[in-house]
Amino acid sequence: MEFWGLEVKPGSTVKCEPGYGFVLHLSQAALGESKKSDNALMYVKIDDQKLAIGTLSVDKNPHIQFDLIFDKEFELSHTSKTTSVFFTGYKVEQPFEEDEMDLDSEDEDEELNVPVVKENGKADEKKQKSQEKAVAAPSKSSPDSKKSKDDDDSDEDETDDSDEDETDDSDEGLSSEEGDDDSSDEDDTSDDEEEDTPTPKKPEVGKKRPAESSVLKTPLSDKKAKVATPSSQKTGGKKGAAVHVATPHPAKGKTIVNNDKSVKSPKSAPKSGGSVPCKPCSKSFISETALQAHSRAKMGASESQVQ
């Protein structure tokens, strides 16, 4: 953009040339200094036409604005005889003809594209119809899809059931382990209690083992009962010495079951009386040592009587 301006003196005409490739934009006209009240009527001449563009006066309109564009040569003049008139504006590059041709070609292309759009619209309608048919075809196979969905649901249910079975098995395994732990604890406590029971002592006289007693557990108040085995009595030379074993009294004549194992009733104690007889006095003793002790005592008694 280039600024432009000129002075038109009284009674004269000025030619204006925008220049090649430019247009001239007339923006403003102003009246010069004047001592008298004077009016100036302005004219523009293009080719053979002369046009009035405005009037300037010292009192009312000393200047006036325009919005006029010229793309070729023109002439400016006014009617004032005492003062000059000043015109201002600017020049702008004019668009080339090639650009205009491009714009025209674009317009033509747009006009040509209109029927193509219609044809494409028809083709699009055909495509839409074909797509609708394609959509309708899978809709017929919807039962198959439903069956597949049902199969998937059944598979999921089976997996859920299997998971639940696994959790149940794990719970049962834990419960069985806990039961084993409890039973092992009970066995340990029973072993400890059996260790607490006194063991029978061997008799000083004789080599024969005394009768063993068994321990029974009675369900009194959900507690384990203990049966103490008595120690064997010393027979130190007494006649008819025998070991007395305390036998537990069974509850209501029934055997007690512990850990799915029945406990047998205790063995009967051996009868009193020995197996070695004394011929002179027809007495029997448990062992030969007892018989020898008896014979010694008898011999001592006879010697004391003789003395």
Curated annotation (Swiss-Prot):
Keywords in alphabetical order: Chromatin regulator, Hydrolase, Metal-binding, Nucleus, Phosphoprotein, Repressor, Transcription, Transcription regulation, Zinc, Zinc-finger
A single Gene Ontology CC term: nucleolus
Compartment list: Nucleus, Nucleolus
Signal peptide: none
Activity regulation, short description: Inhibited by 3-(4-Aroyl-1-methyl-1H-pyrrol-2-yl)-N-hydroxy-2-propenamides. 3-(1-methyl-4-phenylacetyl-1H-pyrrol-2-yl)-N-hydroxy-2-propenamide 1b and 3-[1-methyl-4-(3-phenyl-2-propenoyl)-1H-pyrrol-2-yl]-N-hydroxy-2-propenamide 1c are very potent inhibitors.
Entry superkingdom: Eukaryota
Acidic residues: bias regions: 98-112, 151-197
Biased composition (Basic and acidic residues): 119-132, 198-211
Annotated stretches, region: Disordered: 98-280
GO biological process, one term: chromatin organization
Zinc finger (C2H2-type): 276-299
Family matches, as PROSITE patterns: ZINC_FINGER_C2H2_2
UniProt GO molecular function: hydrolase activity; zinc ion binding
Ranges of Low complexity composition bias in the record: 265-277
Family classification: Belongs to the histone deacetylase HD2 family.
Subunit architecture: Multimer. Isolated as a trimer composed of 3 proteins of 39, 42 and 45 kDa, possibly a homotrimer with different phosphorylation status or a heterotrimer with HDT2 and/or HDT3.
Protein name: Histone deacetylase HDT1
The organism of origin for this protein: Zea mays
